[in-house]
Amino acid sequence: MPGTCGGTTSRCPYILWITRGENVTYVTPLPRCVTEMAQWGSVAGDKVPSCALGGLRHNVHVSGELIDTTEMYLRTIFELEEEGTVPLRARIAERLGQSGPTVSQTVARMERDGLVIVSGDRHLELTDAGRAYATSVMRKHRLAECLLVNVIGLPWEDVHVEACRWEHVMSEAVERRIWELLDQPTTSPYGNPIPGLAELGAAVDESMSAAPALSAVVGRLDASPIRVLIRRIDEPLQTEHDVMAALRRAGATPGSTVKVSRSPGGLLVGSGGEYAEVSLGVADHIAVEPV
């Protein structure tokens, strides 16, 4: 599990550059304590947090930021199930922007590791171990979102992407402390249930409550404006920075009642003087309740 150290570097093909200050000191295989659970990919951009290595702390630089590929895939399958979408390798490729062969190789490794099963019709099923792992990752992700919004004050539209980093490095002790610190939240800032809270001692109903998509509600009505209560924002929409910022400025956040009317570009959504124009595709990922 993450956070355990003292593993050896044997049989690890991953290389990282160890630095002290700004100078490269030496090159070493990535220690097993970092790769125990899954293989790691990289995304160009940021500096990786310091890592315990050989009893010392160093700044670890790869060509970018370490991302746990297995955890990304597990969380994506979990998301698809929440949304009622059949988990297929093609859907994972779309969500993560990866090639078909890359996804197939990763899924094959996950199947070998006992995390998923590829059924006869090619949809992916989480094993008991895979579901427990995916639930843990999503729980950490949504608790990180709560902390980033309620304590750190990160802008709403930036929170999801940042939480995608935190989910891979948060220990169980830290997630438990965050949950207690925030008065035991049960939903994320986007209205999605935090799964697996029973493992932290909660006695709550973690099921996703049924709520139609905004696009479906509007599609059944005439051209007259309607009022709806926003219940939640689906995970795929949370990556759309500009759309999320526009929704926030318009007051169209979970728990808010907004007015919705048709527009040439799709729909106008807002709770006051400012409105956000969203496409019907975006409205597919906004769960609402007519009022």
Predicted regions and their residues:
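Short, compositionally biased terminal leader/tail segments enriched in small/polar residues
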Residues: 2-52, 58-61
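Extreme N-terminal segment that seeds HTH/winged-HTH DNA-binding domains in transcriptional regulators
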Residues: 43-97
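Key DNA-contact positions within bacterial/archaeal DNA-binding proteins
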Residues: 101
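Short, hydrophobic-biased segments on the C-terminal half of alpha helices
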Residues: 107-108
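A short, conserved structural fragment
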Residues: 112-119
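Basic, amphipathic "hinge/linker" alpha-helix immediately C-terminal to the N-terminal HTH DNA-binding motif
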Residues: 122-141
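Mid-protein regulatory/catalytic core that forms ligand/cofactor-binding pockets
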Residues: 168-282
